[in-house]
Curated annotation (Swiss-Prot):
Residues 534-576 are annotated as: Disordered. It is a peripheral membrane protein. This is Protein translocase subunit SecA. ATP binds at residues 90, 108-112, 509. The keyword Lyase does not apply. It comes from Prochlorococcus marinus (strain MIT 9515). GO terms for cellular component: cell envelope Sec protein transport complex; cytosol; plasma membrane-derived thylakoid membrane. One of its GO terms (molecular function) is ATP binding.
Amino acid sequence: MLKLLLGDPNTRKLKRYQPIVEEINLLEEEVSILTDDELRNETHNLKSKVSLEINIKRQNEKLEEILPKAFAIVREASKRVLEMRHFDVQLIGGMVLHEGQIAEMKTGEGKTLVATLPCYLNALTGKGVHVVTVNDYLARRDAEWMGQVHRFLGLSVGLIQQDMSPAERKKNYACDITYATNSELGFDYLRDNMATEIEEVVQRKFNYCVIDEVDSILIDEARTPLIISGQIERPQEKYQKAAELALSLIKAKELSKDGIDPEGDYEVDEKQRSCILTDQGFAKCEESLKVNDLYDPQDPWAHYITNALKAKELFVKDVNYIIKKDEAVIVDEFTGRVMPGRRWSDGQHQAIEAKEGLKIQPETQTLASITYQNFFLLYPGLAGMTGTAKTEEVEFEKTYKLESTVVPTNQVRKRQDWADQVFKTEIGKWKAVANETAEIHRNGRPVLVGTTSVEKSELLSSLLFEQQIPHNLLNAKPENVEREAEIVAQAGRSGAVTIATNMAGRGTDIILGGNSDYMARLKLKETLMPLLVKPDNEHKPPIPQQRSSKAGGGFASKSESISNKNSKSSGASLFPCQLGEDTTRKLSLLSNELVKSWGERTLTILELDDRIATAAEKAPTEDKLIQSLRDALSDVKNEYEKVLVHEEENVRKAGGLHVIGTERHESRRVDNQLRGRAGRQGDLGSTRFFLSLEDNLLRIFGGDRVANLMNAFRVDEDMPIESGMLTRSLESAQKKVETYYYDIRKQVFEYDEVMNNQRKAVYNERLRVLKGSDLKKQVLGYGDRTMEEIVEAYINPDLPPEEWDIEQLISKVKEFIYLLNNLKSTDVSVLSVEELKNYLQEQLRIAYDLKEAQIEQFRPGLMREAERFFILQQIDNLWREHLQSMDSLRESVGLRGYGQKDPLIEYKNEGYDMFLEMMTNMRRNVIYSMFMFQPQSEKETKS
């Protein structure tokens, strides 16, 4: 009713932007007549205007004022550099982002290009802008691709990658616009707050941030906190023994009901992802280990056995992790990518290593942690883009105070979403997927099949291999990851078949007919790699797979490509045509020229990639070699384009890209993202989901209703089932999962918010120390508080002075400050409580000046160094212990719900008391350490 009366709020919002769009369009002609240098000069002028405003409110008002001009400049630069002009709807998207909202834009509507508008505008403040993507590959691609616009306009562009040194990171964070992944930003923030020198801090103060695929980062990954940990020693034989024992234990067929254990040694709750020993299992373990109690604090076993059971039942090889170079490497469940260097905590990773017979790495202890929710809330300006925000609108608003606005599409969507096909068994489903893939492939249409794990992608790959369907595999296995750009470049070609794990989060458009720009880059890389790249670097990435001569298109199967790896023609048929004689000769001359200038086999793969990427830009360059490389790229691209334009036409006529989903995801949003890969920018396309009653989602969350349905349907495994009741069960299962995970995220956020206030206080204190301004004043402040606390602990103001325990008080003060050894009870016996505090604080200051004079005799400046060292040492040690205590508290407060107490309130109250105690201990320890500090000369140290 309200909607009818007031109209759609989204439409009202969009109307508000229309006059500004018209103003930008009017400026287009004025800006288009400027030369490149004049356009760059406009950046300088706008920067000057914004920097004149010191007040943040006035600065924001100035940004609003110059927005039309800034957007018009970016649009013009993009036309010149990328040959891409921002549509009106993209200008609206830019305004939505600038206002700190989430812009929902469908796949293929140019989200990446939209981000250039608010990034340029907010970079004019000189405070830095962060563009956040889900993986290193996309961060690099966007920095190279969209970074051209910013560099052309005179802004500096930085890129953060996983293997960068601190010095490189610092340099890149200092740029006007920095592209990075969410995890790199988060870990750098935590590392900065563990730095011992201000020079080690790599990040600047946060200003404005745009998150690409915002739902993936702020919602899917919000359940898992970022943790930096240090090693602690635990007996390795316990992990091995527990893994052996877990194999001998028998899983119960059902869960316990009404407190009655089922038959078996342990039960598995897949929904809660937990394993629990039954009474029978406890007895069996205690007998096998010859112990009386698995929870004995002197010899604990329960934790090891539970982890071993979880490793056996819930952590599946090639789904949750892969084995790479004798290590268990985590696979990100949302992006399907490996996460080298990341480990599961609480001994879970060690349990998996024991299960797989790998070398067991030492266990770790948390040194610093933060959730993505609290991390991104540190940015004063936060915005995001996604193809699917409306499904999670409530969560964005409640947790992040972010509004969502749906930006209209530039062209009408022509995609067809075909009805789901549901099968009784998984085997039946996979056969049907293989058959539909084969049929669409033979019609000359490209097919993208989304799978949920490495294991499933390889199962489908083997089924297609049996049918002799050439295809490409894109999953977390290293040999496939390295070929990502190449696989995606070809995925839209006629008859191409691509199997991808969790393609939804990959953020790469599939261009019908193939991507001539990427193919030209790959051709150059293939030509130059044997001549310029160091031999030990040569294997990465492998030579591109060849096009298959069988079937009407597609690509060679894995086995074919391996057998051809060393043949000279290996890469030839990957590309749409053989290059003409003229272009081939030019490439040969260029290769010789580059070898002379850059040296034979002296570059790394990354360096060669960088140079080809720079050549692919249109920004002006004075480097003649880069210019020659640019000309060669242009020639190759033009030749490929002539062929691909016909291929694109054929693919369009055949019906465009067909997307197949092989399992419903936990969230409807991720299913919609996968569908969105087809039918970009008004292209034709189609999608279909194939499901089975044995799929995880239905099995875990579908309940008894689905189990009964399985028995009710007496149909063959390869016969699709259609039933209204089944469709409703599916939707209800998905809603159940979404609600379940939302509750988990909400709980993670509420508990971490308690930690967040404490974290901010500790990190602010650390930063003050690192900056080193007035360390003496800070330590004396600690001393004043300590003296007050000692007086309050030993003196009861309600008692008469003659009953005060002055002797004990004096003794305690001397414990902290040995230089006050001459202090006597008679000196203070006539003082009131306030006078006593003031007197002791005065004495502490005199003693501290005396101590400083002693220390400074050794070396001038040593006292300040000691102050910094002891404060940081105490903060870090006590914070680490505090994190452990808070973890233990969180585990234990859950049980208080049984006593009618709210666990969260209990956690807040006790956590606050523990934090106050930690800060008190920190102050006291610093004072004690400073007075006990006795520097040694080098002679003393050597002796």
